[in-house]
Amino acid sequence: MAKYISQVNVSLDKADEQQFANQGFTKINVDLNKGIGGKCVYIWFKHGSVAITKLQVTFNDEMAVGLINAGYTKIDKNLNAGADGDFIYLWYFRGSGEYNTPIEAIDVTTDADGEALKFKNGWERLACDLNRGAAGSWIHAWVKREKKTYICDVTATVSYETDSDHYKKGFIRLDEDTNRGAGGYFVFIWYRQTPDSQRALSELNVSTNDREYQSLEQQKYTPVCANLNEGTGGNRVNLWYKKDHVKHPVTAITLLIGAANIKAYKVTGVPVIEKNLNTGNGGSIENVCFYQWQA
């Protein structure tokens, strides 16, 4: 029996739903427009022998260029159809090699409590709210891979120029701007996964001022050079990592927006780095969250 997610699609109306059902797709019964009206939008999937290995989301045209150049396929149906939010599109890729572990399950959540439990249980969260800009429920897609993977590299970009290179090297973009609501550049965190736990990162951290920067340097963390606050006039903000003594390897990373979401993750014991990526500007409260495998 085929175990991989091999096809993904999106329905915007009853005709789409009937077509996908007839083709053997399975519907994820969560309306992606929940809480805002608009069309009833659903994600569908199908199992097969040729695996999808990457899913990404775009909320502007510039985000799409690197995906196109790297060979990703766009599902050309707006996940915010009929609502007033951003134009949100889902993209997928079928790859091979160390950085392309097959996806075997896909799901959707509508609240932070459900998210936190999934995050602890080996699911990988797509960072972009599928209701982005529409003020409805917090909707996130999730994937689970056929075997455990570990975060082995992190980086960040302050322009779209190197996107295709990052995708071709196996990186996954956290599809939410670390400058959300603050103006400035579109800044994104990227990560790369491997099944090899010995190559994993062991710690992540964030600095939001000179004192924190110096402290993390003294603790032998390595900085990601890009300023996550680039162009906003706020504090310089950097992501940091360690890659030694991998007793509890990092298996997942995501971005959380808003105090309520942060609280839900903390209650379930998921580490949240309590340093706002928008420190010093008027943007959204954003925090990096990660999980370490407890063997």
Question: What is each residue range found by the language model?
Answer:
Residues 1-295:
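Terminus-proximal functional modules
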